[in-house]
Design a protein with these regions (language model features):
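Short, low-complexity disordered leader/linker segments with a strong preference
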Residues: 1-37
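Residue-level recognition of alpha-helix termini/interfacial anchor residues
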Residues: 3, 138-141, 238-239
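Extended ligand-binding regions for polar small-molecule ligands
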Residues: 15, 58-62, 226-246
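Short, glycine-/small- and polar/acidic-enriched structural segments
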Residues: 28-178, 185, 193-200, 210-217, ...
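Short helix- or helix-capping micro-motifs
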Residues: 205
């Protein structure tokens, strides 16, 4: 009688242990089906944002229950437009973009809720090597800058003023070229003396022999809330369980 009880108990244990992997698999599959779909529009695709790409590749967002689609906007103005229009739930751009949208009377303000970078990630590139470069060397020179009012341009002008240069009087800053085209313009047209570039464009210019990195804007500007995640107020109110996982 005792032997029969032990046999029954052993059989029950075996069945329970065997069922565990299947239960776990079913739970995992069920969890995968319930991932919340989120479109994230980033201002640029650069090694500067490596932590974000690592999180995506390592599955950290999926672990948080998010099915993330990454789209590159190529400029804060375009990323902001994507968020306001609903093409993207989350925007990743300079904090200044949400301020501008608010000042323009946005009925559903876009709010910054998390910061990824705390320094500028771009570099000043010259046509020639300048091992003893000083910001004063930009006086009376032409520089390919960024969009007026954008974080890259504002930080650049802050550094100029910090070093005794008036951005409007002491040099010429060309702001007519699209964000993603300045490196090509610098390489193809030698009328400018310097350009401000993110990676990988800065390194590409060096490899091409068309330019040389002479200064880091991140080092010379200091700490600044350079790039942040943001979303519309209505989305943040309705989808708190989602954006808090970003």
């Amino acid at each position: 009688m005792k032997n029969k009880k032990w046999i029954s108990l052993a059989a029950a244990i075996v069945l329970a242990v065997t069922a565990l992997p299947m239960t776990a698999f079913a739970a995992k599959k069920d969890g995968e089906e319930k991932l919340a779909k989120v479109t994230l529009n980033e201002v640029a695709h650069s090694i500067f944002y490596a932590p974000q790409y690592v999180a995506i590749e390592e599955g950290y967002f999926k672990e948080e229950g998010l099915d993330l689609t990454l789209v590159t906007g190529f400029g804060a103005d375009k990323t902001m437009t994507a968020v306001i229009s609903g093409e993207a739930e989350i925007g990743f751009m300079g904090a200044e973009a949400s301020v501008y949208a608010y000042q323009e009377g946005a009925t559903d303000p876009v709010v910054n809720f998390a910061q990824l970078t705390q320094r500028a990630g771009n570099f000043l590139v010259a046509r020639e090597e300048m091992p003893d470069f000083k910001w004063e060397d930009l006086r009376d020179k032409k520089v390919l800058g960024g969009r007026k009012g954008g974080m890259p341009e504002m930080v650049f002008e802050y550094i100029l003023r910090k070093n005794g240069l008036d951005p409007q009087k002491d040099l010429m800053i060309d702001q007519s070229i699209d964000f993603g085209s300045t490196a090509a313009a610098f390489s193809g047209d030698t009328s400018s003396d310097f350009t401000v570039e993110f990676e990988p464009s800065a390194t590409a210019l060096e490899k091409e022999g068309a330019g040389y990195v002479v200064a880091s804007l991140g080092v010379d500007s200091g700490y600044v809330p350079y790039t942040s995640y943001s979303a519309k107020t209505s989305y943040m109110e309705k989808k708190m369980s989602i954006w808090q996982k970003i």
